[in-house]
């Protein structure tokens, strides 16, 4: 529970440790499908649209999202309706009906979302990269899912997900905003107090570890695009196994993304790249490290060679400076403080970190970031990036690929030169 009396609103959020990371190929996309069914009929609101009508009566703004390692559902309401919002979400999480007629309608909605994503060439590149970066485990990194699985899912499969993952000991209730702690704890006890614990799903059925990437590969996706997009990915740290590296990863990315960094000056200010960015996505099951940007077809080979030249120096003393390090630490502390000012956004942030890592990890985040040294950044680069297997992808038009005589091996070979 987070008090914030800035405006007379409150956000009620439910987070579940579910998402694509729990999906075998037979369930690919069903964590997302379940998210859609959450806002449909339940035992307290058994008719179609009753849930939505009740939410409208409360003046609620509500939604959900499915990611790799978290599914969340939230509802922002005027303060006086927070108790009703808790009741509405409690009924949805504990007593869904999974009506066949609603399932059939929501299938089409989800397939429509898939079609929309599929129309983007960047989605095609993203999917191709994930397939190579996580061989044999694509279903666990694909929240949008498999169209065939979504189109043929049944209420029984929804019930299987509910019984396994939608249990109180795998769920967090977060309430943030203009609320009284005593009141909301009493309301939460009233609505959730009789919800019985179940077996820990990750003890009963442990999630297998993502196997290390064994070799570097190139990926080329052809589409009618103007600029050429280049993306290089590595398997990064898992927050549960190497939390220290995740702090170094964020500082590392911040330093390289600073427009004044040597990295940006040599790649972007030189004119080789139109833009280039570095990111680590924190996950408990092998988050990706990504360097991506855009250039022209004429500059593709020199741009890639220059990038690989920078990557080779990431673990070299002197590549990062103390001034760069302290500047990004201060900036991250300020932005983290600002992020906590908006109650609804803070609820989402807390839910993500509870699901992926822990609240203790999040509450110590700024302090641990501040402790990172130049040696920590070099150690992170040495352990996860420099000389490590990677996937290099390019999104390019067919004509430009043909003109360049570009082959997938060219993308990796550039890094070996």
Predicted regions and their residues:
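M16/MPP (pitrilysin/insulinase) zinc-metallopeptidase core fold and M16-derived inactive scaffolds
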Residues: 6, 11-76, 142-143, 257-273, ...
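Buried hydrophobic packing residues in well-ordered domains
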Residues: 14, 32-33, 55, 73, ...
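M16/insulysin-pitrilysin zinc metalloprotease superfamily fold
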Residues: 40-44, 76-107, 259, 280-339, ...
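Short acidic/His-enriched helical or mixed secondary-structure segments at domain edges of catalytic enzymes
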Residues: 56, 109-128, 208-227, 262, ...
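Scaffold signal of the M16-like zinc-metallopeptidase fold and its non-catalytic homologs
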Residues: 85, 92, 117-167, 188, ...
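An aromatic/glycine/proline-enriched structural segment found at the starts
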Residues: 135, 143, 168, 172-239, ...
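C-terminal regions of mature proteins
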Residues: 172-174, 292-294, 323-417
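A structural supersecondary motif
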Residues: 231-235, 256-295
